[in-house]
Amino acid sequence: MITETEHASLPPGVEVITTLPEAAARIPAGAEARTIRVTLPPGDPGAPPHRHPGPLFGYVTQGEILFELEGQPPRILKAGDALFEPGGDVIHYQGANNLPDEQSQLVVTMFALPGTPVLTVVSAEELVERRHLRVTQPG
């Protein structure tokens, strides 16, 4: 974890956006890091509900993303906002472009075992089984 002392020693123009000390434990042994750029056209709903094989860290570089993970209320991420997904069993419900007239974009780095798919779509049956874990209204 980066301490306040370490923050003070950063050169001008360098900023720590997010520190997640609990995230390292979720990275599978033998994982590779994949950096992925996601570009969503205006109003694009993004991928259907899905899972990722491991944790990912990301940053919105352009526009606004409607972002929803299982157990968390949906929220709007704007350019400059960071995000974290634990991966594994957690369902990623929404990653939509919240803007009707501009593209939105994010860059993520995912940690996953070599050869695993970037995402796996969740079946309709499982969505019904896990609906009690979804938080659809802001807290």
Model-based region annotation:
Residues 46-49, 116-120:
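Short, solvent-exposed loop/turn elements at domain surfaces
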Residues 53-71, 81-82:
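Glycine- and acidic-residue-biased ligand/ion/polar-headgroup-sensing regions
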Residues 1-34, 76, 120-139:
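A short, N-terminal "cap"/entry segment at the start of jelly-roll beta-barrel domains
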Residues 25-32, 37-41, 70-89:
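Short acidic-glycine-tyrosine-enriched beta hairpin
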Residues 46-51, 69, 76, 95-98:
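Short histidine-centered beta-strand/loop micro-motifs
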Residues 73-74, 87-117:
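Ligand-binding loop in jelly-roll beta-barrel domains
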Residues 30-31, 43-60:
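A short beta-loop-beta micro-motif enriched in histidine and acidic residues
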Residues 23, 27, 41, 66, ...:
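Extracytoplasmic low-complexity repetitive segments enriched in small/polar residues
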